[in-house]
Amino acid sequence: MKAGHLLWALLLMHSLWSIPTDGAIRNYYLGIQDMQWNYAPKGRNVITNQTLNNDTVASSFLKSGKNRIGSSYKKTVYKEYSDGTYTEEIAKPAWLGFLGPLLQAEVGDVILIHLKNFASRPYTIHPHGVFYEKDSEGSLYPDGSSGYLKADDSVPPGGSHVYNWSIPESHAPTEADPACLTWIYHSHVDAPRDIATGLIGPLITCKRGTLDGNSPPQRKDVDHNFFLLFSVIDENLSWHLDDNIATYCSDPASVDKEDGAFQDSNRMHAINGFVFGNLPELSMCAQKHVAWHLFGMGNEIDVHTAFFHGQMLSIRGHHTDVANIFPATFVTAEMVPQKSGTWLISCEVNSHLRSGMQAFYKVDSCSMDPPVDQLTGKVRQYFIQAHEIQWDYGPIGYDGRTGKSLREPGSGPDKYFQKSSSRIGGTYWKVRYEAFQDETFQERVHQEEETHLGILGPVIRAEVGDTIQVVFYNRASQPFSIQPHGVFYEKNSEGTVYNDGTSHPKVAKSFEKVTYYWTVPPHAGPTAQDPACLTWMYFSAADPTRDTNSGLVGPLLVCKAGALGADGKQKGVDKEFFLLFTVFDENESWYNNANQAAGMLDSRLLSEDVEGFQDSNRMHAINGFLFSNLPRLDMCKGDTVAWHLLGLGTETDVHGVMFEGNTVQLQGMRKGAVMLFPHTFVTAIMQPDNPGIFEIYCQAGSHREEGMQAIYNVSQCSSHQDSPRQHYQASRVYYIMAEEIEWDYCPDRSWELEWHNTSEKDSYGHVFLSNKDGLLGSKYKKAVFREYTDGTFRIPRPRSGPEEHLGILGPLIRGEVGDILTVVFKNKASRPYSIHAHGVLESNTGGPQAAEPGEVLTYQWNIPERSGPGPSDSACVSWIYYSAVDPIKDMYSGLVGPLVICRNGILEPNGGRNDMDREFALLFLIFDENQSWYLKENIATYGPQESSHVNLKDATFLESNKMHAINGKLYANLRGLTVYQGERVAWYMLAMGQDTDIHTVHFHAESFLYQNGQSYRADVVDLFPGTFEVVEMVASNPGTWLMHCHVTDHVHAGMETIFTVLSHEEHFSTMTTITKEIGKAVILRDIGGDNVKMLGMNIPIKDVEILSSALIAICVLLLLIALALGGVVWYQHRQRKLRRNRRSILDDSFKLLSLKQ
């Protein structure tokens, strides 16, 4: 026996010993099957209890016809079977719909998926949240693997594959996470189309001891476990579209698959594949623990706010009654239902609500006595009236920021404020909630500090333990109501109309009064992790879409006991501001006809420009004001300011609320922007340290351009004592130049074409990358920030190694709290540019000075405490810098870069972090080249010879210039994302852009931690315009892996790249060293004679071979005995596990044998 043999025996023992012995092997037999699916099996709108003949909206989706498919579609789904014969299907709860079966495991477990494809095309199964190697990833893309490692990437019809997943500690729920984390699995050959076809299911990974030993296992810690997928399922993307047209359309030949109305009819706004309340009832017992596992999937329109009427949820330690869900977002919510009855779950995005994304859940008393709320506080009375008014969106008549008239032709605002025979102008009939002193409704309540509320109703305030009594008087011409968030109420005080088996006296008809009673028991108020007061909203829900667009919405504040003073205001806060960000769609208002009549519009002109007219009625407002017409928000330097921010509207109402000049804290995390979605509410705290006049605006480029701006003023007040001045020290200087270059978004198409196994013309990327048929291709002239070694700007700092991945981005600028960052900027471009940074304290309060072509300017950025990490943040936070001469056009031209600010002591002298081994900054942005300063030059350079023939408004041309990029690269053309196994990696994830820049970024094979007061586990990070996130990872899984945005259109458009985890070079050198040392121990000769020094003794050479063989034999024998004993222990332990697992591999093997005999 050679010495090396002993080494390999030792390594074998190590590998066997490393197999998890404390967890179960959980076998799942899944078959992929075609089936017929009905989105509305009850054949009606269950929410309103209307037939399809009486519901024009529901019938537009659900009635089949000459060129309409209707409610039934062929789909392909995962089904579970009892064993490898795939003959006995295991039933699942009806409410799971077309979702695959629940897969569940604990930390330490192994999941074996025995997948067989009974369908007509290749599919796979790819998981989130678990560990897998290359042969079990289930995702098709060029990753450098081959042979058996590719068998999992595409299981052909009739084929099968066994996927091996595990849940090691590196993928375990953290201490702060709930007992079980929500994940999904889905097919990943062409993931968007596979998922739209139906191949998706739920997966949970749990902490040890959470699951019992039953088959299937049940959770010990909850009484009910529900899984809900919120998705606009696009049947136009299904692999079965042609089959569905042929089967369900009465005249298939008449179908135009490109017709917009036909495509809309195939987009099913579903919960688990059911629409308009057709989801089978979700039943639970009051006062029992319920786990809700919520997840989303889909496209840019898949922005969902799930509202649970009547109950309160707990998500990551915070109380809420809504959950925000996006494509590949996973939410675990906990509930202990208190109020029995049939309650509504709905997506509160207006278009989704109207299109049927609603379901019921039923809370039964289950013989339990109803809980007695501990209400020891006040009864707070509010007298609120709905009053019709004429509302002016621009009362001062000019843009408060620029001073230009709102009606100046070509100014931008004139689109909304110029009155003509085809435009209403800026004044509309609306309805508003107004506060009165008592039930006589004679004397209004006037409070000077609430003048900024604008169209909003009065602020309703309460503390834990209080009862709120609202007397509502409807003096409007339509039935209206008041529906609250964030409080408890009985059925007779709910303001939403739906078919729950009760009457609805709480919708007030015209000139009718109704009274609502809401309560704030302890289990509904702010938690220990919440701020002192939580921001909520109330609104009319007789017809939620039309009521709120008409103006009926107001703020509600729920505080901890003792947080409100005698005057009803929050203690410890100097200023409170309530801001609603929404696009008021006056086309959806109850008063649309009245407004058109009042405007004396010409119907002929309207019919010629319907789209333009409707667009002019969509008012991008803050509290009902556009273009900085909101009454100015005044505060003093050093004040504690509470910003109560509210969102409302439809899927385009994705708002990144930016506070120019100062930063805010959100749950202890430092932010420059706060994200709002329909029916989401945020409390942000600011302590302004930067006097001046600043903007509040929505970061989504189009929203800001369309007027979603306001002004706040920070004054140096004599009554305020200055806080101790922060000490700064000059420390870091960057030399940055703006230069114009040719940029290629996709220099190599081989990855893209191999991925899709297609030609250039048939690839999804053709529209973006082809330079034929009037398109520009992948090359564009751009301006970029580049770093130089010194102020001569002669020697560029090379981009290699750690900075190779930056791509189009400028250099990664780093600083610590207390630093002064000096940026020497030279503009070598052909037009004026500047450098403006988020988060820092800029020395020039009027905004950064622009550098003319050839000019050199120096910018100074101070880094105060409020620019660095908050108490709940990671050690570093990410920001962004860009040219701000024209922020939108400058950024799309290419001038953008990352900025990182760290706590003191984190950065090394060379700028790197001492707590991380690698840092990567990634910008996910749809570069809209149509808005670049260089569009005309690019058309002339890269377009057709007759560039004057290019139609700049052509839809295909416009789409072709929208580059769905990661650091300016498409289809895995970004280079430099390489780490070694075991390294600590910080990812600075950045997003800017428009409301379509919703990016849910998924890391294959790795999970990461993100900070939100505590550490939480995830493998998808959500990004929106103006959000900058930091996630941290310990790279654990060697291989080349995919990273991509999970939004359907973004996947196909190329927003994906690969990152590589390499094994440590030390692994090989260590093994080599061990081998050499063993060899030395066996054959090392004594220098002076014919003996060998071995085991401390001089042994004659002639006896060495015999002794060596004997020693090795003894070692091997002892090793075998140890292995045998260990194997017996392991076998007994495993047998106990397997006896509790009826689907074990051994049992199934015997079943198969008996069937064959």
Swiss-Prot record:
CC per GO annotation: basolateral plasma membrane; perinuclear region of cytoplasm
Keywords tagged on the record: Calcium, Cell membrane, Disulfide bond, Glycoprotein, Ion transport, Iron, Iron transport, Membrane, Metal-binding, Oxidoreductase, Phosphoprotein, Repeat, Signal, Sodium, Transmembrane, Transmembrane helix, Transport
Chain residues that bind Cu(2+) 5: 655, 698, 703, 708
GO biological process, alphabetically ordered: intestinal iron absorption; iron ion transport; multicellular organismal-level iron ion homeostasis; positive regulation of iron export across plasma membrane
Binding site for Cu(2+) 4: 304, 347, 352
One term of GO molecular function: copper ion binding
Residues reported in the UniProt entry to bind O2: 126, 186, 1002, 1004, 1046
Residues the record lists as binding Na(+) 3: 768, 777
Residues the entry annotates as binding Na(+) 2: 416, 425, 428, 616
Binding residues for Cu(2+) 1: 126, 1002
Binding site for Cu(2+) 3: 188, 1004, 1044
Record bears the keyword Metal-binding: yes
Record topological domains on the Extracellular side: 19-1109
Sites where the protein binds Na(+) 1: 70, 73, 265
Membrane topology category: Single-pass type I membrane protein
Binding positions (Ca(2+)): 134, 152-153
Binding site for Cu(2+) 6: 999, 1045, 1050, 1055
Binding site for Cu(2+) 2: 128, 186, 1046
Ranges annotated as spanning the membrane: 1110-1130
Enzyme Commission numbers on file: 1.16.3.1
Glycosylation sites: 49, 54, 164, 236, 587, 713, 757, 930
Role, per record: Plasma membrane ferroxidase that mediates the extracellular conversion of ferrous/Fe(2+) iron into its ferric/Fe(3+) form. Couples ferroportin which specifically exports ferrous/Fe(2+) iron from cells to transferrin that only binds and shuttles extracellular ferric/Fe(3+) iron throughout the body. By helping iron transfer from cells to blood mainly contributes to dietary iron absorption by the intestinal epithelium and more generally regulates iron levels in the body.
PANTHER family with a match to the protein in the record: HEPHAESTIN, MULTI-COPPER OXIDASE
UniProt name for this protein: Hephaestin
Organism expressing this protein natively: Mus musculus
Gene symbol of the encoding locus: Heph
